[in-house]
Amino acid sequence: METLKSNKARLEYLINDMHRERNDNDVLVMPSSFEDLWELYRGLANVRPALPVSDEYLAVQDAMLSDLNRQHVTDLKDLKPIKGDNIFVWQGDITTLKIDAIVNAANSRFLGCMQANHDCIDNIIHTKAGVQVRLDCAEIIRQQGRNEGVGKAKITRGYNLPAKYIIHTVGPQIRRLPVSKMNQDLLAKCYLSCLKLADQHSLNHVAFCCISTGVFAFPQDEAAEIAVRTVESYLKETNSTLKVVFNVFTDKDLQLYKEAFNRDAE
């Protein structure tokens, strides 16, 4: 039973548990500040293999993450649509969205980013959702017997996030410019696969991150155009009632999405 009352105490418990699990001979020096404790916890959680955890660990982790996540929640009903009443562009932290599903830009190993404290969306979503997501993703890969293909989509629970579900998709990685037609089509396929999966699960709304524009190096302007065009076409052709949020983090992406919708309205 989870009896630790402060998130600092919970962090210390989780850090100690992961350190013992590693059979590491290094002496563990526990930081004094909450911020430093969080960074140490996050780094250990990021590199931890997809191995089972104890019920006690899960109870402590869930109590901490759910408490931290509920302190910063953005409700879809507070967002203003950019087109009609079902398409939104919103700048902020996608892990704060109270919504049916958020989209995670995954890699083909499909286990979440395993680089300690890396600031990619894959890392942040897995960190804030909890270890269960990595375990679920590992089971998906085990069952299909291969890495995840580009342009496909899989769904897991959101666990400790405000979002009910996470839809994971692997975008194309750009190694040379200009972007090939194949990679343009693969990016569009990512959006289509996520939309279809959301409708198959009778979800009401989904929020997309900017797929492939980070370390996968897809040019932001092209990616925004493809995202907007693909989503609008899907909603029109299928008569889907999905509400779709384009989540952006940078000012540049915000401007690019606004420009894409302005061109669409001309």
UniProtKB/Swiss-Prot annotation:
Q: Where does Zn(2+) bind?
A: C113, H118, C120
Q: Which cofactor does it need?
A: Zn(2+)
Please state which protein family the record places this protein in: Belongs to the MacroD-type family. Zn-Macro subfamily.
The enzyme's E.C. designation: 3.2.1.-
Catalyzed chemical reaction(s): 4-O-(ADP-D-ribosyl)-L-aspartyl-[protein] + H2O = L-aspartyl-[protein] + ADP-D-ribose + H(+)
Q: Name one GO molecular function term.
A: hydrolase activity, acting on glycosyl bonds
InterPro entries, sorted: Macro_dom (IPR002589), Macro_dom-like (IPR043472)
User: What are the alphabetically sorted keywords of the record?
Assistant: Glycosidase, Hydrolase, Metal-binding, Zinc
EC top class, in one word? hydrolase
UniProt name for this protein = Protein-ADP-ribose hydrolase
Per the UniProt record, the source organism is Staphylococcus aureus (strain MSSA476)
What the protein does comes down to: ADP-ribosylhydrolase that specifically reverses the SirTM-mediated mono-ADP-ribosylation at an asparatate residue of GcvH-L, by releasing ADP-ribose from the target protein. May play a role in the regulation of the response to host-induced oxidative stress.
In terms of CDD domains, this protein maps to:
Macro_OAADPr_deacetylase
> Which residues bind ADP-D-ribose per the record?
D93, I94, N107, C120, I121, D122, S212, T213, G214, F216
The cofactor remark states:
Binds 1 Zn(2+) ion per subunit.
Query: Which Pfam families does the record associate with it?
Result: Macro
Name all Macro domain ranges: 74-265
